[in-house]
């Protein structure tokens, strides 16, 4: 008899909403030269092919910094920089074109065979490159001529869209031509960022050597707003880091987010499957740079009833929460606050005020099992306490049988039944023997 894998079933169920959400959307993927050199690059290419097979429109932008540096070293040619930007003279330009051209051929070949040895073997991936970008020179700064180092002048986004709509993957590198026919060396982060903005991409995705941006303790920061990301860039640059995959992608992500790209993702090129885990799981694996959090704390509406019921049912069955019917929830939905992440209700709580006695009850506190080790409970407590203060209440009480210490650690003190509002005293269940805890607001 074949073994049944419940883990596979659960994983597929969780990923299906993201498959549907991503289908038909445009993603810009930025691959630095470091990622291309890494042993895991073949897996990354295979995963890019898988994304394409799911109906996602893909623009892949590759960089070549380490390959260019290696070419310069081989030819005993010293690289030159001004204000941390490479000066591309004629000799350097030829070596840049050589490195970029080799990478383009290599990546095209790998993408063309990315679905081999998979159930999708035989499916054809059309990879298109072209003069979609027109460049212009950086010019002269402080008397220093950047020569063939350039910037983007314009992008033919309509031509790119035509290729994407025809089912092709668009592959672009760091070299573009000008209206005069000259070639210019661009930065991959500028190319990826401007493409994401002009194409109105849903996402921009970049790879670095770590799993994302980390805090002082070394833990991954799952979400950054542009201002926070800019502060991180400033810190890295002050430490002398101008060219790592992290700082280069963050620069682009900040600009992209402020220009309308909803989410930019930074993940590791060393971790097999990081791209799929980031895109097809609720919490991802790296760092997102977003204008608006994927997680919202808000007052519940009638549309949240199904999510709240799904969240509290297991706790009701365990006797942790008092059972509530759908009808009761519909009548009391205005009392509830929810934490929602990607349309999933992951936490809830309710405030029942007793204004005549200047006290309120915090009830039906529930947090999804996957998020109990984080701060969602504290988030709800802060929101409920703020609502209570706005209503002029002076105290907040809870009735609990299992979370006594959690509430006490947050300032709640034990109390007797006589401390409850009169209406609540009359309804107190002496068989359940819930502990009464009160917080002075």
UniProtKB/Swiss-Prot annotation:
Keyword Transcription annotated: no
Catalytic reaction equation(s): L-glutamate + acetyl-CoA = N-acetyl-L-glutamate + CoA + H(+)
Location relative to the cell: Cytoplasm
InterPro entries found in the cross-reference section: AceGlu_kinase-like_sf, Acyl_CoA_acyltransferase, Asp/Glu/Uridylate_kinase, GNAT_dom, NAGS_kin, NH2A_AcTrfase
Pathway it works in: Amino-acid biosynthesis; L-arginine biosynthesis; N(2)-acetyl-L-ornithine from L-glutamate: step 1/4
GO biological process, one term: L-arginine biosynthetic process
SUPFAM superfamilies the UniProt entry points to: Acyl-CoA N-acyltransferases (Nat), Carbamate kinase-like
Domain called N-acetyltransferase: residue spans: 295-434
Gene Ontology CC annotations of this record: cytoplasm
GO molecular function, one term: L-glutamate N-acetyltransferase activity
Keyword annotations: Acyltransferase, Amino-acid biosynthesis, Arginine biosynthesis, Cytoplasm, Transferase
Domain of life (superkingdom): Bacteria
Keyword Membrane appears in the UniProt entry: no
Family (UniProt): Belongs to the acetyltransferase family. ArgA subfamily.
Subunit structure: Homohexamer.
Protein name: Amino-acid acetyltransferase
């Amino acid at each position: 008899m074949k073994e049944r894998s419940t883990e596979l079933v659960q994983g597929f169920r969780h990923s299906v909403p993201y498959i549907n959400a991503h289908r038909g959307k445009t993603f810009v993927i930025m691959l630095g030269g470091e990622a291309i050199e890494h042993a895991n690059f073949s897996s990354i290419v295979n995963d890019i092919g898988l994304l394409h097979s799911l109906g996602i429109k893909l623009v892949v932008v590759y960089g070549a910094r380490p390959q260019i540096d290696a070419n310069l070293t081989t030819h005993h040619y010293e690289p030159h920089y001004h204000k941390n930007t490479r000066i591309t003279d004629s000799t350097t330009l030829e070596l840049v074109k050589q490195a970029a051209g080799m990478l383009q051929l290599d990546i095209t070949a790998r993408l063309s065979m990315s679905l081999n040895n998979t159930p999708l073997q035989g499916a054809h991936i059309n990879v298109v490159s072209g003069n979609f970008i027109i460049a212009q020179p950086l010019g002269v700064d402080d008397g220093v001529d950047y020569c063939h180092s350039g910037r983007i002048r314009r992008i033919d986004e309509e031509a790119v869209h035509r290729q994407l709509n025809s089912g092709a993957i668009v592959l672009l590198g760091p070299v573009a031509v000008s209206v005069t026919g000259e070639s210019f060396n661009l930065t991959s982060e500028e190319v990826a960022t401007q493409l994401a903005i002009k194409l109105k991409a849903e996402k921009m995705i970049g790879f670095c050597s770590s799993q994302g941006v980390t805090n002082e303790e070394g833990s991954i920061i799952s979400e950054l707003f542009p201002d926070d990301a800019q502060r991180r860039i400033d810190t890295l640059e002050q430490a002398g880091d101008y060219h790592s995959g992290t700082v280069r992608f963050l620069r682009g992500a900040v600009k992209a987010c402020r220009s309308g790209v909803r989410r930019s993702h930074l993940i590791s090129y060393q971790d097999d499957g990081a791209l799929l885990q980031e895109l097809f799981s609720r919490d991802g694996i790296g760092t997102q740079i977003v204008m608006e959090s994927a997680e919202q704390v808000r007052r519940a509406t009638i549309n949240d009833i199904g999510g709240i019921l799904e969240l509290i049912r297991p706790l009701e069955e365990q006797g942790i929460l008092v059972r509530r019917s759908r009808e009761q929830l519909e009548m009391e939905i205005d009392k509830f606050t929810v934490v929602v992440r990607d349309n999933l209700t992951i936490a809830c709580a309710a405030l029942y005020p007793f204004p005549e006695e200047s006290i309120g009850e915090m009830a039906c506190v529930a947090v999804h099992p996957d998020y109990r080790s984080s701060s969602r409970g504290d988030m709800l407590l802060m929101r409920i306490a703020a609502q209570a203060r706005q209503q002029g209440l002076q105290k907040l009480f809870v009735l609990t049988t299992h979370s006594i210490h959690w509430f006490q650690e947050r300032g709640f003190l034990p109390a007797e039944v006589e401390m409850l509002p009169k209406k609540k005293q009359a309804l107190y269940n002496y068989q359940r023997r819930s502990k009464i805890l009160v917080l002075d607001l």
